[in-house]
């Protein structure tokens, strides 16, 4: 009986830490957004970042055209610190030199009819340590603390994997729907062409078996 109470208390503490780690992992994902980018259009986003802070940008085109987009990032002085054209996906990490509003834009201006769907994940700063004074402590982690760190890393891996598979599933579904539409249109076109050819052959065969009777006209002197 005496050992069951500490075990129950330790189990409750571990479950509480797991819940906090789960909420923390979700909160530390940063700004994620999936948006529509019309043809011949540009969409920009702004974020104020302190000096000496690292930020990262990951993006991927989910649907539309050749699954490509133009992207560039500007610092507060208007200088281009990143530019790529017609990229399907990419990642960019940068440590700021000045404080101010940084702007990153996605452009579909090179396309005149392809509508795009773009996903991006924008994160600012380094992830804080899971445990207080974790970077400065000289003692070894306890078994529970080590378990929490391991679980936290596993949760991060799970979240990243879920995001990857979610984007991949959305992209594959869009391609399948586009292929299905093309097959449907092609089938309708073949049906119409087959009907026209069949009708023409019937008329041609009918003309072969139609007797042409001479027309007698009276000649008046």
Swiss-Prot record:
Membrane topology: Single-pass type I membrane protein
Assembly notes: Monomer in endoplasmic reticulum, endoplasmic reticulum-Golgi intermediate compartment and cis-Golgi network. Interacts (via C-terminus) with COPG1; the interaction involves dimeric TMED3; however, there are conflicting reports on the interaction. Interacts with GORASP1 and GORASP2.
Cytoplasmic side: 206-221
Protein known as: Transmembrane emp24 domain-containing protein 3
Motif (COPI vesicle coat-binding): 208-221
Extent of motif COPII vesicle coat-binding: 208-209
InterPro entries: Emp24-like, GOLD_dom, GOLD_dom_sf
Subcellular location: Endoplasmic reticulum-Golgi intermediate compartment membrane; Golgi apparatus, cis-Golgi network membrane; Golgi apparatus, Golgi stack membrane; Endoplasmic reticulum membrane
Gene3D superfamilies assigned: GOLD domain
SUPFAM superfamilies documented for this protein: Supernatant protein factor (SPF), C-terminal domain
Span of domain GOLD: 42-124
Family in the record: Belongs to the EMP24/GP25L family.
């Amino acid at each position: 009986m005496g050992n069951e109470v500490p075990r129950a208390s330790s189990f409750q503490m571990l479950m509480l830490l797991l819940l906090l780690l789960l909420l923390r992992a979700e909160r530390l994902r940063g700004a994620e957004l999936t948006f529509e980018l019309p043809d011949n259009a540009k969409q920009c986003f702004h974020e104020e970042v302190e000096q000496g802070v690292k930020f990262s940008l990951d993006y991927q085109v989910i649907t539309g055209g050749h699954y490509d987009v133009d992207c560039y990032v500007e610092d507060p002085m208007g200088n281009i610190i990143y530019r790529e054209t017609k990229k399907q996906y990419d990642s960019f990490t940068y440590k700021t030199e000045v404080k101010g509003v940084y702007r990153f834009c996605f452009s579909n201006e090179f396309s005149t009819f392809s509508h795009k769907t773009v996903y991006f994940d924008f994160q600012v700063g380094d992830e804080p340590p899971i445990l207080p004074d974790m970077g400065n402590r000289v003692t070894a982690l306890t078994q529970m603390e080590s378990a929490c760190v391991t679980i936290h890393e596993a949760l991060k891996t799970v979240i990243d994997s879920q995001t990857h598979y979610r984007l991949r599933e959305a992209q594959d579904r869009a391609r399948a729907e586009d292929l299905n539409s093309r097959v449907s249109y092609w089938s309708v076109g073949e049906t119409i062409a087959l009907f026209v050819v069949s009708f023409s052959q019937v008329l041609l065969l009918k003309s072969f078996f139609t007797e042409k009777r001479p027309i007698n006209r009276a000649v008046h002197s």
